[in-house]
Each structure stands twice: as C-alpha cells, then as structure tokens.
Amino acid sequence: MVLLNRRKIQPKEIGQSADSFSETPWVIKESSERINDYDSDLKKLDFYKRDIFTCEISGKDGLSYFKALKSEEQHREKVRYLLPKELRKAIANFANFSPIRKVGHLVESAFQRFSNRFFIGDTVCLKTIQKNALITYKEGEPNLVESPTIENNVTLFLVKDVFQSNGMMESEKGEISAPKLSLYLITECLNRESKGAALIVGQNEIKRPESHFSKFIIACFLNEILIKVSNKEHAPWRVKQEYIERYDVNPKCSPNMIDYLPDRMNSSSSELYTPLTIPPESDVEPADWKETSETSETSETSLSKIKAIDDEISVSFDHIYDNVNSLAYNDLKGTVDDKELPFTGPSIPFENISYLDSSLEYKNIDQKWFKECSQFPTERLLVVYQFLSFFGRFIGLSHFNFDQFLTTIKCTSPEALVDEYVKINFLKTYNSKGSFTNEKPRNEIYNQVTSSNVSQREKANVFNADESQRIPSNFTRNQKMRKFITDKSTEFVMYSIFKGKPLKNDDMEFQSYEKVNILYIDIVCSLMCLMTDNEPDWNCNLMDNWTEEKRKEEGNKTEIDIAIEKCLNYGDTSWVKLLHNKNFSNGNWLICLLGILQQNTHMIAYSDVAKCITKKILPLSMNFVNLGDELWDNFRKRLSIKDKIDVLWVLVDFASNFSSYIKELVDKVPKLCNGIRLKLDSAKKEYIKLKRQLKTLTKNRVKLHSNVSMNRYGSDECKGKVNALKVKIAYLMEDIAFLEAKLIQSDIKRLEILGKDRNGNRYYWMDSNGSSSAISEKNEELYNCCFLWVQGPSEADINFCLDVDVESLKKWELLAKAKGTAYATKEVFSIFRSTDGSYYQIAQGENFMIINSNGILMRPTIPAFIDKKIISETPEKLLLSHHQWAFFNDIEDIHMLVDRLDDLRENEGQLKKALTSKMDRIEVSYKQQFKIKRRIECDETFKKNHKLLKNNEFTFPELKRIETTCTSNGQHFSNMEKISKKLSRTKNDLVLEAILKDVAHLGECERALLKKQQNLIYPLNFHFEQLRTIDLEFIVETKRKRQEDILTKLLNHQRYKHISHVSGYGISSQRVDKAAHLDVQGILEEIECQLISRRREDEERN
C-alpha cells in the first residue's frame, strides 16, 4: 500500500469516487476509480502525478502514486524471485515477536543469521572463483527493477537437499535454530532449473551471490510482512495475519511480551505501525528490557492474563496447525551414524603434528612413529602428570609444567648429560686430471686458528677417547636445530653431528647436573608418603581379593629373594621404618621404593612392572660401600625412560585406587567447586544488576542532555554515577574471570576425553591449562601441558567404525613397527599415496587411481571406511592403534580440525561442541606456552650466536674455490713428503745441500704464513670482506672452525636452558613430611581475601 507522510492512503481518501449509478463516469484505470465530473478527474490525476508518495515495500520516496504502486509490485516479485520460500519462512519465524525493536537492527540480525545458512531452492555459487563458466543468465530472463547482475564466469547452483543435525536452542526465543554447519546437495542450474552434475558441499564452501541476498532484499520482505503487536512503547514486531498460514508462523506470544499486547485481541490492526509508518522517535531499542530470569515469582494476575490470551490465540489460530508442524522451515533431522554420511574427498593434512619418542623428545611424525609409540607409555605419562598437577600441592610439591616434568625424567639417564658437537668436512672433489683429492692435511695447518675460542668444557666433550674414530650422534633432541644444521650440507661441504665424551661422576658439571634430578626424587618421595600415615600402618586400603597367594614359601628363597631381603633391611634398619620416619636421604628413598615394589609384586596389575624394575636396580653383588649410591647408579644406568615412567605410574595408580587420603580429597572437591560456583553466580548476578542500572542512568543522562531547560548540575551528577558504575562493572568482570579460573583450577578432571571423530580417534585436553596465567600474570610460567592430544582408535572402534578384522590389524601393526605406517598400509590395505598427492589402489597387480592430485574422486564406487580414513589422514600419519599418541603443535591445525568436524555426525558433533566451548582457553594456552618456551630457548646468548653464524657463513665463491685449491695443496704437502724421504735416503753432500735449500725455502714460506695468521686475529663478528688482500684458504678454514664452534653451542643451548630451568626447582621445593588436608572453608575464605586485596590494589592504582 502506498504511503504518504508515513501514512497509508487509499484512493477513496484522495477524492470522492463517482456514484455507481452515474451514466458517464470518468474512470482512472490505474486505481479503478470512477469520477463524476471532468474537473474532479483532472484534480485527482494531478494529485496522483505529484512526486510525494513512498513505496511501502522498498521505502523509496519521491515517487508518483502510480510509480509507487508499480514499485511495490516489482519489489514483491523480486523478493519472491530471489528469496526461496523456505528462506522466507525462516526469516518470518525469526522476526515474529523478536526482542529486537529497531528495524535497522532487525534487518542486520536477520542478514547475519541467514547469510551462511542455506535452504532448499537457494541459488548459490562456490566460493572459489571458477575459470570456465558453466551457467550464465541470458537476456530472455525476467527483467526486474534493479535485476540482479551475475558476475561473469560464475557457475550458479541450486540447493536440492539439506543434511542437518540436531538444532540448538535460542537463548532469547527458546526456539530451535539451524546448526552452524551442514552439508548441501547442489546441482548446476540454468533458468532456475537444475541441470548437470550434483555436488555435496559443506556450509563454508558455498555462498549466495551478492545480488541475490542483501540487506535491502531482507528489508523489503520485512516491510511487507511485519506489523507492530500494538502501538505501545517498545512493542515487538509480529507477522501480519495474512502471512501466518503462508509461512507457517507460530502466532503465540512469549510470556515476557504479554504486557505489549493490545488490551483487546480483536481490535483492528489497520492503525498499527508498520516498519515504514513507525515514527522515528518510536523506532528505538528499549533501555529497560526485562529478562525472563530476573524475577523468580509471577503474580496470579499475570498468570491469569497469560492463560486468557493463550485461550484467545488458540481459538483464533489453532486451526492453522491442525495439519502442519510448528516451525516446519526448520524441521531438522536427527544426528546420524558416522558411517551414513557421504565421502567428501581428502582433507588437507595437518602440518604440525608431533609425538613423544622413547627419549621424551618432541618429534614430527616420521617413519619410526609407530615403533616409538608402541614401545613408549604416553598414556601413563599423561595420567601421572595430571595426577601430580592437581594433588601435588597437597603432598608438598611445588608447581612444575610438563616440559620441566619431561626434563627431570630425561636427566635421570646419563645419556641426557652427553653433549653433541658439530664437524664440518669438505667433500672430496674431482680434479681436472681425473683423480680424487682430500683436503684433510690442509685442515690440520689451521688447527690453531680458533682453538682459543673453545671453552675448557667443550674441549672435554668435543673429542672422544679414541681420537681416530668419532661416534655419530643418534640423539633426537632439538629437532629444529638438527634439521637446520644437516640441511646446510652441499656438494662441497658436509655438516655432521657427533656424540661428545660422557661425563664422569667426579666432574664438576656432572655434580651440577645432579640438581635436575631433585624434582624426580621429590615426586617419588611425595608419592611414597601417601602409603603410610603417622602411625606405622599402611594408609592404603588393599583389598584381599586383588592379591595372589604368595608363590614362594619362606624356606624356598632364591638368590634374588635373599638379595632383596638384605637391601630392604640394610644397616639393620627396615625399609618400613625408613618410610615411616620419612628418612629418604643418602639413597634411602630407593630402598623404600624397592620395598613398595615388592609389596606390589603380588598384585596382578603391577606385578610385571615391579619385578622388572626390582631386577634391574638390585646390585649385581653385595660388595658395596653405600647401598643408596649403588642403587642410584643402577637406577640411572639400567632403567630406561619407560621404566622410570612406570615407577611413577605404579605409585600414582596405587595411591589413586587405595589411598584413603586421596579418597578424602576427591570427596571434598565437589564441595569446594560448589562454593566457588556460588561466589561466581553471585558476581554474575551483581554484574547483570549493575548493567541494568547503567542502561537506566544512560537513558536519563541522554534525556537531561537533550533538554536544555534541565539543570546542568543534574546532568553532571548523572555523569558521575555512570562513571562510577562503569568502574564497578570493570571490577566485577575481573572478579568473574578470577573465579572462573579458580573453578577450573580446583576441578580434578584434568585429562578428560573430549570426544571421538568419525574414524574413532580420541581427543584429550587438560582443562586447567592457562588458568594460572589468567589468575596472575606474574606466574605465567605456571602453565601445564598445553597440547591437544589425539589417541588412535581402540580395537573395538577399529572393527566397528572401519570394518577391519583383527588379523589384518595385527599384520598392519607388525609391518608398521618394522618399516613404517606407509609401507604397512600399502601391503595390508593396498593403498598408497604418490609424490603429487594422488591416491592409488593396487588390484590384480595394477595401480588404479582413486583420488587425483586435485582431490577429485576418480572411481564411481564409494571407498571403504578404512580407505576413507587412510585418505583423510594420509598413510604416513595414519592412526590405527591405541598405542599411537600425537599432539597438535600449532593452534592453526586445531582451527582446521574444528572446521573439518561435522555437526551431523554423532561423535563429531559432540567433539566439535566440546572443542568450540574450550577454544578460547586453548588459544590462550598455546600462545602462553609458545611465549615462555621462546623466552627460555631464544635468549640473548642464542641470538648472539645466531648473528655470529650469519657473519661466518660460506659464500658460493669460497666453496667453489675449494675445488680448485685442493689439487695445489695436495701437491704442496706431497712435495714436503718427498723431500723428507730423499733426505733420509741420500748420502751425497751435493744432493743433501740441494735438499736443505728446498727445506729452507719451504720453512720460510711456512713462517711467513704463520706470521700472516698471527697478524690476522679478528673478532668473531668481523667481516672478512673488509680485508684488502684476501687469503681465501685461510678464510674458509677460519669460518669452518668458527661455524663448528657456534653450531655446537646452538645445538646444545636448548638442552642447557631447560636443565638450568629445572635445576632451580630443587632450591624452591620444600617437600612436607605430612600431606595437607583440603580445607574447603579455608580455601573459600582465602579466595574471598584475594578478591578484596585485588580490589584494593586496583583502587590504589587508579
């Protein structure tokens, strides 16, 4: 209907129409009016032609009456053409009784809500620009006003079907909304008809053309269907009655909007505002919007009013829903089994996936991945750390992060204290005469050039006991620096890494390294303290039916039993007494550990581990001076990293299952968490209350500011109150963040499984990560294990999800352990990946392409479930065993994982929801860990050495010169060798005189060269290009020695820094003799005191 001055007008309102009995009426065919006289007709036409009208649909003004009518019809057609019916239903249901009052905000919200949600009949295009256009619009299509122009070379598709998961509840309206991610079946379209091939795409892979979906189109549609519930202030919008049945809109009003309904339900709606007739002063958001949760009681009058209105609505509109479902536009399908959804092609492989090898070093996934994982108890390591991270503070342990935990375990092995050194060798070159030459003698000339730059400590480690043979290093530490060094090798020069000389027990550095073991010893001692209480009784409730009968009688003891008994009663002191008195000094802790392991040998769960460790740490003979030192030496040298982790796991698992003290702590934790939650809820309620007051004061301040006649003092007073409320709200936000971090920190469930993906892989996250940094920036190093871990599927999941039998799985594991996962996958499942990324399947001795390098499926048959897993994870990174553990080393890969997870899948939907809810903390944790590690490893010393290395790099001319100088140098030393031989054989004086002259000449040359070397003593950062005369050989040799020195320091720097970082723990650690009890009331009071003190500090600072 045409508008004039924001008011709807009818033709009868402009002038009097002709009498129906008039014989010669004048007819205006555009408005179907009949006018009696010619003058009235001219006046009416003149009025219609004035440019004073507004189109009710588009809002365009300055039109004549007839142009406005035509504009309305054209825009109605445009809305129906561009917006499919399902999308119009969704928008209508969203806008009906929406809490958003301002029209512009409602249009913006609708655009944001549905810009990435697609419905059947939608016209879409792929986000990637296509080179060849399949479909374009032609000139013969409907010519609409401002008809959409389609970009050239863009293929259009029609949405034919939608695969959706369970809906999510909207907090504002309580209705089901579409999921964030869906799959769509689309087909190529021409003239609004589907043709060509069909594709299945994800929600993030398609978009609507900009000309098909815009805020203007949405505004036109809302202008057509919306009307105010009433003309009361801040009344909500509703859909007009004539559109309710058409778009399946629920006409029932929510209880929180009852006050805005008109007093009489059957009152005429012709006087109600529409989006274009509402006055500008009324088109505002309410400042005193009432939340439904603000009041806990509802008066009897309100309840009766709601019931009466519901009854009236039911009588008027219930017939609409007799044969249709409510919210039919969003009738979502339930979650489906992970096997039922179609295969969408290969995924982009994760680049930064790493694992822990048997030496506790971080490594990128390689060929030895499965072998390392199958021999290393990653799960036990994580279980031990999550136990210590929570209960450590109650058993006297200071906080330590995951990297410190790994370092202290590694340093209990002598191998971890061995340095590495770098050697640079110039390769043999093929000279012009066709013979090979070696430059080794030339190296020995310049051995003195940089020997003063090597420290005494490095001299001891650079050379092995046997000077003629170096031991290549097989360490896996510092992977980035190792790769950096080995990648510097070229056809002229080779960079090699060798093991240094092992440190002896009496070395000063060995004794300084012993400090790093204090953390491991403190952990073991603290766990052993949980076994007994102050009385000489066990503090663990061991159930009789969990033990086996004693296998050996007292009179039938073996040599091992006798040796164990002597160790447990060494020095006429029982190990039980040592444990009871907490006497762990001088190696007594190992005697107590040996006794606890012996007690556990009769428990099925721990018997194998206990027997293996006992056998390894027992002395070979009883001839020793100090039993504690002997046990410690055997513990360090004979036990592997796996054995040392198993020691901690036995103690942790035993205490978790049988310790009454741990049970007491676990029982008190829920009470503590509930107390923190009460404080948190109170703070949130206060925050909501202050926000409401702030809105009210802001509204009053605007009124005072707009009214000039008001007192200025009142405006200033209102401004002061607003600023005070803002300060209080800021304090409350800090308190809420503090309490949320405390709640996370107090929760026991650290290593929780987040969910499983479609292939059965399980994901873990220690939820306390980052909580310390959120509480106090001063203790930002108190992070835990900031990694998202993924574990391979169990045997049951492999059989159920992938349809792989046990025999094939066992065969794959054996081959993967021997030759890697890629080889095993090719042999067992007959699938391999080529260098260009294509996937092939071996059948009858021939290779058939499954997926090409562009990720397109080349075969009509759908791949099997195991084939889908291989293609999605790649054969090199295939997870097919519960022994395989890996972690995401980059936050970008985690974002890629979340985007890849499918809401429709039963398992992945839960996993995606869990990851999304924790994503903020995960991002903070990764960022924090990276920052701390970089600060530790990349300190000023590292930067200085890295800069010196750049100044001493080989240039290409220098490397090329090596090839031409090798021959002359070889001839020079060969001449000296020949002269020496002649001198030893000759007896002729004349010949001898000639030889001596040659020797003197060579001696002068040598002295001149040495003098030149002595004059050329330059600092490490000196640029050799500054020399006027350049001795290329000397420069090359000097650079080589300097590079060896610098690269050796850089290679060992990371390990030095981590060891020194953990060595400081022993100074601050103070293990208590008695475990502390969890005082819930005391902790809650302490939290309250911390809140008060933080508030005072902020006030003083401000």
Curated annotation (Swiss-Prot):
Keyword Ribosomal protein belongs to the record: no
Subcellular locations according to the entry: Nucleus
GO annotation, cellular component aspect: chromatin; chromosome, telomeric region; nucleus
Highest taxon, organism lineage: Eukaryota
Main location: nucleus
Residue span(s) of domain DDT: 375-435
Coiled coil: 673-743
GO terms for biological process, alphabetical: subtelomeric heterochromatin formation
Keywords (A to Z) from UniProt: Chromatin regulator, Coiled coil, Nucleus, Repressor, Transcription, Transcription regulation
InterPro entries for this protein: DDT_dom, WHIM2_dom, WSTF_Acf1_Cbp146
Span list, region Disordered: 271-301
Domain WAC, chain residue ranges per copy: 23-131
Misc. remarks from the entry: Present with 3060 molecules/cell in log phase SD medium.
Known function: May be required for the activity of an ISWI chromatin-remodeling complex.
Record-given protein name: Putative ISWI chromatin-remodeling complex subunit YPL216W
Organism: Saccharomyces cerevisiae (strain ATCC 204508 / S288c) (Baker's yeast)
